[in-house]
């Protein structure tokens, strides 16, 4: 919005030229989202407490979690509001990629909101069914993928990390299916990771910061050519979007850090994962998400292995509990130690993913 309002004024006052620069708008998108999360956090915590929207704790989990029962949840409303407002304020709204990213974020957020609302407000034990939630995610991701591929004539090749000239073409239908897999998979992986105080939000912010770099580099022809990656002119505005994700995440962390005053709920975890997935698609760094979000992959795989092994062996388990962060808790690791060590893993994976820009 500010880009369109203030950039034309540059011919009268050169100071307004700064609004042309993606780096400037990315920084201020991040700061705006951070301030929104930071300022509105106490009000939301108090409001959710008054509404008795409190977290339900599984009795078969770590006993140390029982004291968290009743902690306000659905804090993802704050994150999503901050991200969307900040992006609308600072991004170039004529860029179709901005609307695709916001559409996926809003769509997945709405699914998470309905799920949380049914459980927390209407007191339904399970909210949306797993199948219903999955189908809705597929619909949202499918619409986004179709608009990108058919509406915008998007590139249907896939960039393979570490390989310079390996870019298989999936064809239009194949790429739409692939995009659905990336977005829905990322969304559910982040959702599974959100089980400890601050565990999910920091890796999300780290991943968003990494894709901020990918988006900026891909949008510049010289950088993209030098690094032998796909040049995506429209991806520059994804830096602004990612900046908003980073800022909103850090602002939310202030209240979500151990011991948490608020949890994000599905209304936070589902759209955050979906946002990472759609940015990966739009920047043509789809498979890099497996590295950038390796922590989320590890959490999701631990659940898949646990469930599969349990069914095959008729009752045996690989881990003490899944997702894997609970396994380490039950082994005796204090919750803060699990959280910080997982953050360290996320940082290492982010650095590795950035190295793929040059190692090819």
Swiss-Prot record:
It is found in: Cell inner membrane. It comes from the Bacteria. Keywords: Cell cycle, Cell division, Cell inner membrane, Cell membrane, Cell shape, Cell wall biogenesis/degradation, Magnesium, Membrane, Metal-binding, Peptidoglycan synthesis, Transferase, Transmembrane, Transmembrane helix. It catalyses: UDP-N-acetyl-alpha-D-muramoyl-L-alanyl-gamma-D-glutamyl-meso-2,6-diaminopimeloyl-D-alanyl-D-alanine + di-trans,octa-cis-undecaprenyl phosphate = di-trans,octa-cis-undecaprenyl diphospho-N-acetyl-alpha-D-muramoyl-L-alanyl-D-glutamyl-meso-2,6-diaminopimeloyl-D-alanyl-D-alanine + UMP. One of its GO terms (molecular function) is UDP-N-acetylmuramoyl-L-alanyl-D-glutamyl-meso-2,6-diaminopimelyl-D-alanyl-D-alanine:undecaprenyl-phosphate transferase activity. One of its GO terms (biological process) is regulation of cell shape. The chain crosses the membrane at residues 25-45, 73-93, 94-114, 134-154, 173-193, 198-218, 240-260, 262-282, 287-307, 337-357. Pathway: Cell wall biogenesis; peptidoglycan biosynthesis. The keyword Chaperone does not apply. InterPro entries: Glycosyl_transferase_4, PNAcMuramoyl-5peptid_Trfase, PNAcMuramoyl-5peptid_Trfase_CS. Its EC number is 2.7.8.13. One of its GO terms (cellular component) is plasma membrane. It is a multi-pass membrane protein. It is an enzyme of class 2 (transferase). Its cofactor is Mg(2+). Pfam families: Glycos_transf_4, MraY_sig1. The keyword Cell cycle applies. Belongs to the glycosyltransferase 4 family. MraY subfamily. Catalyzes the initial step of the lipid cycle reactions in the biosynthesis of the cell wall peptidoglycan: transfers peptidoglycan precursor phospho-MurNAc-pentapeptide from UDP-MurNAc-pentapeptide onto the lipid carrier undecaprenyl phosphate, yielding undecaprenyl-pyrophosphoryl-MurNAc-pentapeptide, known as lipid I. PANTHER family: PHOSPHO-N-ACETYLMURAMOYL-PENTAPEPTIDE-TRANSFERASE, PHOSPHO-N-ACETYLMURAMOYL-PENTAPEPTIDE-TRANSFERASE HOMOLOG. This is Phospho-N-acetylmuramoyl-pentapeptide-transferase. It comes from Desulfatibacillum aliphaticivorans.
């Amino acid at each position: 919005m500010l880009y369109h309002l203030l950039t034309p004024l540059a011919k009268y006052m050169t100071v307004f030229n700064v609004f042309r620069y993606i780096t400037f708008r990315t920084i201020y998108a991040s700061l705006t989202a951070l301030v929104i999360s930071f300022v509105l956090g106490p009000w939301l915590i108090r409001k959710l407490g008054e509404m008795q929207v409190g977290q339900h704790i599984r009795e078969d989990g770590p006993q140390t979690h029982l004291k968290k029962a009743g902690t306000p949840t659905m804090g993802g409303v704050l994150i999503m509001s901050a991200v969307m407002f900040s992006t609308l304020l600072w991004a170039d709204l004529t860029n179709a990629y901005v609307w695709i990213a916001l559409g996926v974020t809003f769509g997945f957020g709405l699914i998470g909101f309905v799920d949380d609302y049914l459980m927390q407000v209407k007191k339904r034990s399970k909210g949306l069914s797993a199948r219903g939630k999955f189908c809705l995610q597929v619909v949202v991701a499918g619409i986004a993928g179709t608009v990108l591929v058919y509406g915008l004539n998007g590139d249907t090749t896939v960039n393979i990390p570490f390989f310079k000239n390996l870019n298989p073409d999936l064809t239009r239908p194949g790429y739409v299916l692939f995009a659905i897999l990336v977005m829905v998979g990322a969304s559910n992986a982040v959702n599974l990771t959100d089980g400890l105080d601050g565990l999910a939000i920091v890796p999300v912010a780290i991943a968003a910061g990494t894709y901020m770099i990918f988006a900026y580099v891909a949008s510049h022809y010289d950088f993209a050519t030098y690094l032998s990656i796909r040049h995506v002119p429209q991806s520059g505005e994804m830096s602004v979007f990612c900046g908003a994700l980073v800022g909103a995440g850090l602002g939310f962390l202030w209240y979500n850090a151990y011991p948490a005053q608020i949890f994000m709920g599905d209304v936070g975890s589902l759209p955050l994962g979906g946002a990472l997935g759609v940015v990966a698609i739009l920047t043509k760094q789809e498979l890099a998400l497996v590295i950038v979000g390796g922590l989320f992959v590890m959490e999701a795989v631990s659940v898949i292995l646990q469930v599969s092994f349990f069914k095959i062996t008729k009752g045996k388990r690989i881990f003490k509990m899944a997702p894997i962060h609970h396994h380490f808790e039950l082994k005796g690791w204090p919750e803060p130690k699990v959280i910080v060590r997982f953050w360290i893993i996320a940082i290492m994976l982010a650095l590795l993913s950035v190295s793929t820009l040059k190692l090819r």
